[in-house]
Amino acid sequence: MKIVLIGLIRGYRTFISPLFPPSCRFQPTCSQYGIEAIERFGAIKGAWLTLGRILRCHPFHPGGYDPVPPVKPKK
């Protein structure tokens, strides 16, 4: 599942994203954030974090540096 989601993001970056001007308000970009989140947290939580990030990426949000959160150690 993880490989499929990352493949979809890479496909978007290769085929769809070049058709539009750069518009992501965040650093790293939303697609890079998605790849990092899925690699770090797995398919379910990574996709959830990515969805939240995409929903925040709009003209009324200031954007800026917003890295993937670190993995919290289990107690």
From Swiss-Prot:
A single GO CC term for this protein reads: plasma membrane
Q: List the disulfide bonds.
A: none
Location(s), subcellular: Cell inner membrane
Q: How does it sit in the membrane?
A: Peripheral membrane protein
Q: Cross-referenced Pfam families, in alphabetical order?
A: YidD
Keyword set for this entry? Cell inner membrane, Cell membrane, Membrane
Q: Which NCBIfam families match?
A: membrane protein insertion efficiency factor YidD (TIGR00278)
UniProt similarity note: Belongs to the UPF0161 family.
> What's this protein's function?
Could be involved in insertion of integral membrane proteins into the membrane.
What is the protein named? Putative membrane protein insertion efficiency factor
Give the organism the record lists.
Gloeothece citriformis (strain PCC 7424)
Show the taxonomic lineage. Answer: Bacteria, Bacillati, Cyanobacteriota, Cyanophyceae, Oscillatoriophycideae
